[in-house]
Amino acid sequence: MKSIRLIIISGLSGSGKSVALHTLEDQGWYCIDNLPIGLLSAFARHVNDTCPAGGGRYAVGIDARNRPEDLDRIPAILDELQALGLNSEVLFLFASRETLITRFSETRRRHPLSDGDAALADAIAREEALLAPLRARADLTLDTSNTNVHQLRDLVRERIEHDPGRLSLLFQSFGYKHGIPPDADYVFDARCLPNPHWEPRLRPLTGLDAPVQHYLEAQPEVAELTGQIEALIATWLPAFRKAARSYVTVAIGCTGGQHRSVYLAEQLAGRFATGMDAISVRHRELNR
């Protein structure tokens, strides 16, 4: 049986779609950018009919410049791909409006949906509405608001470059003062734990540093919360696999995203690393 993997990459302009597509191309994927939605089914059938016996990996970029009626057909087209027996997935990238406006201002590029005197914010809002059907069917969404080009490349490789039979499990730390990650499946609050920030010698360090780790290891409630989160995730991962979910993102937050959440994310990733899943860790605020 052929092992064919087809990923549809879409998202808001300025969020990193081209970076994601080029990253997969560098990894040996056959990539097509800006494919009209009306040709997606025909391309999938062609791949299914002509792909070598050993299978292949294909990525297709789709954006909002398609006709609105074609974008509305996305759910039906994705169902058709599943009926063909293809291992198809949708990756959707997005960023906050403020971030997108800043990126377009810095690059001085024109938004693809800008027409005449329309404000950039209006073009972004229109694009969000047009791509809503595709985002609703996404297997994986990535918020790139706080991610640079190099970090996005690493993130795409970590989340996509794995055996399709394995679940990609990401543990992400964050700071509540900077907002909850909108792409998380689970969110856990670690602000109830003792805060190393109030120890002057630990304040400039992070949860990756041994002194902070030793401080948190000595707190019984830290071990208790870590164990409870581990038990909950371990209990429900089989249900995600049964539902054919390929990606799960677990976010752990503290006030600033420097100490407690970083430590817990590392601890949880280590506890699940010996299993069958593809494990990755990301510390959002440490990348700022």
Swiss-Prot record:
User: Could you tell me what this protein is called?
Assistant: Nucleotide-binding protein Mlg_2233
Main function = Displays ATPase and GTPase activities.
Which keywords are on file for this protein? Answer: ATP-binding, GTP-binding, Nucleotide-binding
Residues given in the record as GTP binding sites: D63, A64, R65, N66
> What does the record give as the organism's lineage?
Bacteria, Pseudomonadati, Pseudomonadota, Gammaproteobacteria, Chromatiales
Q: Name one GO molecular function term.
A: GTP binding
Where do the TM regions start and end? none
Q: Does the record bear Ribonucleoprotein in its keywords? A: no
Q: Which family does it belong to?
A: Belongs to the RapZ-like family.
Q: Is rRNA-binding there in the keyword field?
A: no
Tell me which domain of life the UniProt entry assigns to the organism this sequence originates from: Bacteria
Positions contributing to ATP binding? G11, L12, S13, G14, S15, G16, K17, S18
